[in-house]
Design a protein with these regions (language model features):
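Conserved catalytic cysteine-centered active-site region
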Residues: 1, 47, 92-134, 172-236, ...
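Flexible, low-complexity linker/loop segments at domain and module junctions
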Residues: 1-9, 154-160, 372-377, 407-409, ...
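A glycine- and small-residue-enriched flexible loop/hinge segment at structural boundaries
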Residues: 1-151, 167-182, 201-219
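Condensing-enzyme catalytic core mediating Claisen C-C bond formation in acyl metabolism
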Residues: 5-13, 17, 29, 277-373, ...
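Active-site-proximal alpha-helical scaffold in enzymes
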Residues: 136-149, 202, 206, 221-255, ...
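Beta-strand segments within the central parallel beta-sheet cores of soluble alpha/beta enzyme folds
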Residues: 153-164, 219-225, 249-254, 330-339, ...
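Acyl-CoA/ACP chain-elongation machinery
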Residues: 245-305, 338-352, 386-393, 410-463
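A glycine- and small/hydrophobic-rich beta-loop-beta segment
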Residues: 357-381, 386-389, 396-402, 406-409
Length: 528
């Protein structure tokens, strides 16, 4: 029986509230306090450039046209300011809410907006492009930069119909350059542009990649499923590599949901972390802040009140392992299992159901078969969906705890990135995947920074809900699980294997000479 190709991750990139994804910059921002000093300086430098705080001037650096004598000193002295312009924070009124609908009427002032001063559309001719599409261009370019191999080399090795692209949004592109502009124009006394409708479509991210970056004529598409969208696209990519239909697949999502209309929608269903309830919770928890502390607006698995929206665009390049060997691509991990299931009959479309129990259990069973029970129990972790709502903290923790108990996992490390990034809707699973690749490299799982302890109604007998970074050596963790509980019953989970496990699997299939001849993975430096 012929073995299926192994879908391996050969590049990644994108951007979200924590920074750009390549070189693990955004991930490192979420584990900043656990980094070595040199890595902290590297992150600060990258963020300062993104924000336009510093610029290269020949062989030196400048701020506001004045030369910086010692860049490291400058970065260290301004560390708090630089990082305060990233991750979940107070919304920028001028950019997101000039009419005061969010800040003055709804009064929900927190958002996981892109780093202050960063404009993804400034790097190319982006006139009238919806924000998520600008983020797509930046994010996919970032991915190709991380890849380190010219795309023309892929085109020489692979026929055009063996390349595929799956990317898009869940909500649609609803800012004023997309569907938002089309819906608002007559009300505001103007008319829709010829681009509003097209640029608002949910699959337009893939179209932009095909038309403006890769020139792709192969398969294209997008599997939208609320918060599980990225994992749905990942499942598509994995399956067509395994069945031989495609050899290279771009998997991604892009979403820019920080608009007054979307905030209003989540506010209406009581899912949003608004200022009034934020202050009330801070008082209940005896925290010192009297005004809304936007930094802690999203509190997954703790005492919480609701979610925060965030912007993100994330992409990976999947390919079969033989092609990766042939071109000498770096391998960051592999995707053996992605499961998606609906909830079946239920009384409320927004309520939880059985689907997520099935998806996660399937992925954990797969890991148990591949890694064995001991490694599963001691060297894996999970990125929970962790929206920050009271309903999620009980329903998802029950799922995680039940599955952990069933497989003999005593204290399963649980992270929830939305405390840092907000909820990027379609891209939530992509944020998790990018962070996972960072954990392979640095050995650190991000904590849930906004909580002091799990809420009393959280099911955590078999869970280790991380209130501190979990620090191990690089590649200590052999596998990670990504989880998404999407609105309406769109549930998906994924098993991601680390690079050393992936390489071990590849080595069993291929000759030692083929393995030696290819630069597959550069091991990260061990921690002290």
């Amino acid at each position: 029986m012929t073995k299926k190709p192994i879908p391996v991750i050969t590049s990644f990139g994108g951007v979200n509230a924590s920074g750009r994804s390549s070189d693990h910059i955004g991930y490192q921002n979420t584990v900043f306090d656990s980094l070595f000093k040199k890595d902290q300086t590297k992150v600060l430098k990258d963020l300062a450039v993104m924000q336009g705080l510093i610029k290269a001037s020949g062989n030196s650096w400048s701020k506001d046209s004045e030369k910086i004598e010692n860049l490291n000193d400058f970065l260290n002295q301004n560390s708090d300011q630089i990082r305060s312009n990233t991750m979940v924070r107070k919304l920028d009124r001028e950019l997101y809410d000039p009419d005061g609908i969010i800040l003055d009427q709804i009064k929900a002032s927190a958002g996981g907006q892109l780093p202050t001063g960063f404009n993804p559309g400034s790097f190319y001719s982006s006139r009238q492009h919806a924000r998520a599409l600008q983020m797509t261009i930046f994010g996919m370019s970032d991915t190709l930069g991380q890849f380190g191999i010219k795309w023309s080399e892929i085109e020489e090795k692979v026929s055009p119909d063996q390349i595929a692209v799956f990317s898009g949004s869940a909500m649609g592109n609803l800012d004023h350059f997309g569907l938002g502009g089309m819906m608002q124009s007559r009300i505001k006394g103007s008319r829709s542009s010829s681009k509003n409708l097209a640029f608002g479509l949910i699959g337009m991210s893939a179209d932009f990649i095909n038309a403006y970056i890769l020139g792709n004529v192969g398969r294209t598409g997008h599997a939208a499923g609320a918060c599980a969208t990225f994992l749905f696209n990942l499942q598509l990519g994995k399956e067509i590599i395994e069945n031989g239909t495609s050899r290279v697949v771009i998997v991604g999502s892009a979403e820019a949901p920080i608009t007054p209309e979307i905030y209003d929608g989540f506010f209406a269903n009581s899912g949003l972390s608004d200022d009034k309830r934020m202050v009330s919770l801070q008082s209940q928890l005896k925290e010192k802040e009297k005004e809304p502390n936007q930094r802690k607006a999203c509190r997954p698995f703790g005492d919480n009140i609701g979610m925060v929206l965030g912007e993100s665009a994330q992409f990976i390049i999947l390919m079969d392992e033989e092609l990766a060997l042939e071109i000498g691509a770096e391998i960051y991990g592999s995707v053996p299992t992605v499961a998606s299931h609906a909830d079946g009959f239920k009384s409320s479309i927004s309520g939880p159901g059985i689907g997520n129990y099935i998806t996660l259990a399937k992925c954990v069973a797969s890991a148990n078969e591949i890694l064995g029970s001991k490694t599963l129990q001691e060297q894996t972790f999970i990125h929970a969906h962790g929206t920050g709502t009271p309903a999620n903290r009980t329903s998802e923790s029950h799922i995680l705890n039940k599955v952990a108990k069933a497989f003999g996992i005593k204290k399963w490390p649980v992270s929830a990135l939305k405390s840092f990034l907000g909820h990027s809707m379609a891209v939530a699973g992509g944020d998790q995947l990018i962070s996972t690749l960072g954990t392979w490299d640095k050995g650190v799982i991000p904590r849930i920074h906004s909580i002091q302890k799990p809420a009393e109604d959280v099911y955590d007998d078999n869970l280790d809900i991380l209130i501190n970074d979990k620090v191990e050596k690089p590649n200590f963790f052999k596998a990670a699980f990504l989880n998404a509980k999407g609105f309406g019953g769109n549930n998906a989970s994924a098993l991601i294997l680390g690079p050393d496990v992936t390489l071990s699997q590849i080595k069993k299939r291929h000759t030692n000479k083929a393995f030696r001849d290819c630069l597959l993975y550069t091991s990260p430096s061990p921690r002290d």
